[in-house]
């Protein structure tokens, strides 16, 4: 399974093409749109979310509510594009129109300046448009397809925010994936501890009044993953490594950890390793899950627990100093639309990219042309694992 995304933030549409989804997977536009709505939600989101109401259109690969095995093409129309017809025109336009929204003041923390140097742009809008987090719309759409596939294989995934700008959220122990999903869905800030809800919302309001932004940490948990996805035989086949790449590829994500993560560096080995248990009913299990569901780069049957850290959104309403690329004079950075935080939405994107990588691994390990064969192969493997 592989995919590509295309489109600009203020262009006419966003597009994704997925190849390798088996035939026979039940799939509707609403399956995708539900996750797109979740991506646009969350406390603290701003003006763009009021303009766009993303809805996907299938243009290939799905017929009568099921995948056909052919490449799946999905489009999302950018409604805001009507205000940008000249600025984002594919055809050449008059110089006076080109300069109308030209960007020469790069924003610190964005791709603006480096992209301009790399691709030799005199208008940094070219960098801004493609590097925008608007691109994650299609990664969420691809992830929604992946999640439908995982659900057919009895795998469940959820995400929630565990740190808001330095404020850690207490997470009750032993919550199931379903419980995490339910609690986070009921929260405007995607946390599982409702007692902290108003405190976090008040904090976001204060950050907005200050013209500033905050980052934080989001966690994705996946249950029901078969044993042995990934491999230790080559570095690039380790599944946790592939997940790490996917997570830090998300806009503004700067780090990733599994299970205890960096805390493991402060503990003794006897306090980190997960003891192995066996029972006739459950087969092999672990006493703890400090390693986040991975051993040797492979899934061990425990829930996958992965966290990603997101830096504060770099677009500030009290902009930092920058330099004009034409005059080299100091200026305040360009201000585009921004939010005080996008952590709940970022969690949705992280859930999507994790689901996508897991779907890719499942299809690699249990190669099948249609859903029925895939389900049979996974069920057979689970029986083998239990009786090993």
Curated annotation (Swiss-Prot):
Catalysis: reaction(s): 5-O-(1-carboxyvinyl)-3-phosphoshikimate = chorismate + phosphate
What GO molecular function terms would the record report? Answer: chorismate synthase activity; FMN binding
Q: Gene Ontology cellular component?
A: cytosol
Task: List the Pfam families hit by this protein, alphabetically.
Answer: Chorismate_synt
Which Enzyme Commission numbers does its entry carry?
4.2.3.5
Give the similarity note.
Belongs to the chorismate synthase family.
Biological role stated in the UniProt entry: This reaction introduces a second double bond into the aromatic ring system.
Q: What NCBIfam families does its record include?
A: aroC (TIGR00033), PRK05382.1 (NF003793)
Q: What is this protein called?
A: Chorismate synthase
Name the encoding gene, please: aroC
